[in-house]
């Protein structure tokens, strides 16, 4: 068991539902209410930020915390174990007083920061993922750190937190960004052998934060939106005060004109005075647009479509269909009107996220936008055997009574089942003291309907201060089973079901 010192907080992203835990725990034979389906054989894993050392509440950004992965293993109708582990980056090893087992090569990505955003399995590996050019890590099945991952040297400069798995081929598609790439993002395909088989550099208007993208059967969809790299947030922690203004001017003059070599981009890893600020901010002068590229195309094949200024972390799904003889692209997204404008510590203070649908007529170039549900919601998931094709159902987590900025009695996190065909929705009947995070869809064996499956995700019962793994019927939203955990799991970001192979 490893324990870090807990820090006092005056930051809503360090409190309540979002507060970090200070102890690594291993527990076996977990108590269960209800019955775990016998066919579930694997691990539910979720990643999220969990600072290992004291941070400055005034500047700490939710997205910059050290990575901690939480997992529950299910087999034979039982919850075999729960584990939570920090990913052993050099900074985490130093904070815990442990030797650094493997230091990333500069080509692998930016060492500063941690892979705190997603966790999934691919080609026999468990991968802790992050974006912005930061190094990703491989974990063991028991969530201990193996070391940095660059797909056996086939992909340099970092990856993404949001790859999309092609349900037909099993390959991982991704769009990756980093300030070190200049005015470019990179589309990549990781084969089922775990190696990058294709990369394409795509020119964009600046240096945007591009958290995710959409994949259809025929296209890659890129969201080039007005949250961009802000050198003002980087310089103060890394250079003397008298050099700050010249350094900012240098960064602003270089950024986007050249691609920064990997060793130079990695220099910040050795600078003293780590900052917990996020170096991205709302940029009202930056054009908002959507790029559409054929899967086998290149930069010259990208078509750009202007949209109203906004920000999207999470597209729900995308597909194309024929309407009146024209090909139309349908994009379902969770949309914010702005991001990191007034509140620079997290996504909660600028606007409420709504579920929107954008359609692009690829023949005429016309773009239409429709708000499908204006209730605040996030973390959209579907039956991912349908990625890239038409879908009907989606599952989102609502945020009511204060968007991600506290865990008082006013905060609730309803679970919505969205019918994207009729526009209607159903709300799960959850205990009002239960706060939940992202819910993952796991299809049932021999499923005969799109929604024939299980929803799986972590919750916190604030009345009992208890962490839980919830299993819900995806058709009815009724409880199937609850696994009672030995500690609270912070809300975190993204997770996935990793079946035993």
Curated annotation (Swiss-Prot):
Q: What class of enzyme is it?
A: oxidoreductase
Q: What is its EC number?
A: 1.13.11.-
Keyword DNA repair found: no
Q: From which residue to which does any coiled coil extend?
A: none
The UniProt keywords, alphabetically, are: Dioxygenase, Iron, Metal-binding, Oxidoreductase
Gene Ontology terms describing biological process: carotene catabolic process; carotenoid catabolic process
Q: Which Pfam families match?
A: RPE65
Residues recorded as binding Fe cation, renumbered to this chain, are 162, 211, 314, 494
The annotation note on the cofactor reads: Binds 1 Fe(2+) ion per subunit.
**Which cofactor names does the annotation list?**
Fe(2+)
What are the recorded GO MF terms, alphabetically?
carotenoid dioxygenase activity; metal ion binding
Miscellaneous: M.tuberculosis is assumed to be unable to synthesize conventional colored carotenoids, but the data obtained in PubMed:20929460 reveal that M.tuberculosis may utilize carotenoids from host cells and interfere with their retinoid metabolism. The occurrence of suitable carotenoid-substrates (i.e. beta-carotene, lutein, zeaxanthin and lycopene) have been shown in human plasma and tissues, and the apocarotenoid substrate beta-apo-10'-carotenal may also be present in lungs.
Q: State the family it belongs to.
A: Belongs to the carotenoid oxygenase family.
Q: What does this protein do?
A: Catalyzes the oxidative cleavage of several carotenoids and apocarotenoids in vitro. In contrast to other carotenoid oxygenases, cleaves substrates at two different sites, namely the central C15-C15' and an excentric double bond at the C13-C14 position, leading to retinal (C20), beta-apo-14'-carotenal (C22) and beta-apo-13-carotenone (C18) from beta-carotene (C40), as well as the corresponding hydroxylated products from zeaxanthin and lutein.
For this entry, the protein name equals Carotenoid cleavage oxygenase
Instruction: Record the organism.
Output: Mycobacterium tuberculosis (strain ATCC 25618 / H37Rv)
């Amino acid at each position: 068991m490893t324990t870090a010192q807990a820090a006092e907080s005056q930051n809503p992203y360090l409190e309540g539902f979002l507060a970090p835990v200070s102890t690594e725990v291993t527990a076996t034979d977990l108590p269960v209410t209800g019955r775990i389906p016998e066919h579930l054989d694997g691990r539910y894993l979720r990643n999220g930020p969990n600072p290992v050392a004291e941070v400055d509440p005034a500047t700490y950004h939710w997205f910059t915390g050290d990575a901690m992965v939480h997992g529950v293993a299910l087999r034979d109708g039982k919850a075999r174990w729960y584990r939570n582990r920090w990913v052993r980056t050099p900074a985490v090893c130093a904070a815990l007083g442990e030797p650094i087992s493997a230091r990333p090569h500069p080509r692998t990505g930016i060492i500063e920061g941690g892979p705190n955003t997603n966790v999934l399995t691919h080609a026999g590996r468990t991968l802790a993922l992050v974006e912005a050019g930061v190094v990703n890590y491989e974990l063991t099945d028991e969530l201990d750190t193996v070391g940095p991952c660059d797909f056996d040297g086939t992909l340099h400069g970092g990856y993404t937190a949001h790859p999309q798995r092609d349900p037909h081929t099993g390959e991982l598609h991704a769009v990756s960004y980093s300030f070190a790439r200049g005015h470019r993002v990179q589309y990549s395909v990781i084969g089922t052998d775990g190696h990058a088989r294709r990369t394409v550099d795509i020119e964009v208007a600046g240096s945007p934060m591009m958290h995710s993208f959409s994949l259809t059967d025929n296209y890659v969809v890129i969201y080039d939106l007005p949250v961009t790299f802000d050198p003002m947030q980087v310089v103060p922690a890394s250079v003397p005060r008298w050099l700050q203004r010249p350094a900012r001017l240098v960064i602003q003059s270089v950024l986007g004109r050249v691609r920064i070599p990997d060793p130079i981009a990695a220099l910040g890893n050795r600078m003293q005075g780590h900052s917990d600020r996020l170096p991205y901010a709302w940029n009202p002068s930056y054009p908002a647009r959507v790029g559409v590229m054929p899967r086998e195309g290149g930069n010259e094949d990208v078509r750009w479509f202007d949209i109203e200024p906004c920000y999207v972390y999470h597209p729900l799904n995308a597909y194309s269909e024929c309407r009146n003889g024209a090909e139309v692209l349908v994009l379902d997204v969770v949309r914010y009107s702005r991001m990191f404008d007034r509140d620079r510590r997290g996504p909660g203070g600028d606007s409420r996220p709504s579920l929107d649908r954008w359609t692009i007529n690829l023949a005429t170039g016309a773009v239409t936008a429709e708000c499908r549900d204006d209730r605040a919601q996030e973390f959209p998931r579907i039956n991912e055997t349908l990625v890239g094709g038409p879908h009907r159902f989606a599952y989102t987590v609502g945020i009511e009574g204060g968007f991600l900025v506290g865990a008082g009695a006013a905060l609730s996190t309803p679970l919505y089942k969205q019918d994207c065909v009729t526009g209607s929705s159903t709300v799960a009947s959850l205990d009002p003291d239960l706060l939940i995070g992202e819910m993952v869809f796991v299809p049932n064996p021999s499923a005969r309907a799109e929604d024939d499956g299980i929803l799986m995700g972590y919750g916190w019962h604030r009345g009992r201060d208890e962490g839980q793994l919830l299993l819900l019927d995806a058709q009815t939203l009724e409880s199937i089973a609850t696994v009672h955990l030995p500690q609270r799991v912070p809300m975190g970001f993204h997770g996935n079901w990793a079946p035993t192979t």
